[in-house]
């Protein structure tokens, strides 16, 4: 049997909800060793969704809990970064820096690290700190106004394209 194309690649997944976990799911399906890292206190918000969805989006991944606000959690994460190829995170801009594990710190530990920051509106610009979820994008684009009856409340779909 042929090895999968990303076999040997290690990914640290700090993302939550759906976009980041979907991204790392594809990497895992292609053979990457993905370690999903959840906050000890809250975990991934997607755990509050249907259990089958959470399990499906996180299949083929290993998991662990770390509190990056604590010295021990940060130290463990930084040791993992030394042996990782990719870090994927979905915090608002500046959160990783405030936790003491921003790009510059991680780069000092691993010059070859690929750092992927998934945000709704990018790392700079006027909307950078806004919440970034499907309903926000639909409202901002005007699509939400076009859903539902004319002159009535918008129809909030259960199908979230961008979240």
Question: Where in this protein do the model-derived segments appear?
Answer:
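N-terminal helix-loop segment corresponding to the beta1-alpha1 unit
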Residues: 1-163
């Amino acid at each position: 049997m042929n090895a999968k194309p990303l076999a040997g690649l290690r990914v640290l997944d700090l993302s939550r909800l759906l976009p980041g976990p979907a991204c790392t799911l594809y990497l895992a399906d292609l053979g990457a060793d993905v370690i999903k890292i959840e906050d000890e206190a809250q975990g991934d918000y997607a755990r509050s969704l249907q259990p089958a969805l959470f399990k499906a989006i996180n299949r083929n991944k290993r998991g662990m809990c770390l509190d990056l606000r604590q010295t021990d959690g940060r130290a463990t994460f930084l040791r993992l970064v030394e042996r990782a190829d990719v870090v994927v995170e979905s915090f608002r801009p500046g959160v990783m820096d405030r936790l003491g594990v921003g790009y510059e710190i991680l780069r000092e530990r691993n010059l070859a690290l690929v750092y992927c920051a998934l945000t709704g509106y990018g790392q700079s610009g006027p909307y950078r700190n806004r919440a970034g979820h499907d309903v926000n994008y639909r409202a901002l684009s005007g699509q939400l106004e076009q859903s539902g009856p004319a002159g009535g409340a918008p129809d909030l779909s259960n199908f979230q394209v961008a979240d």
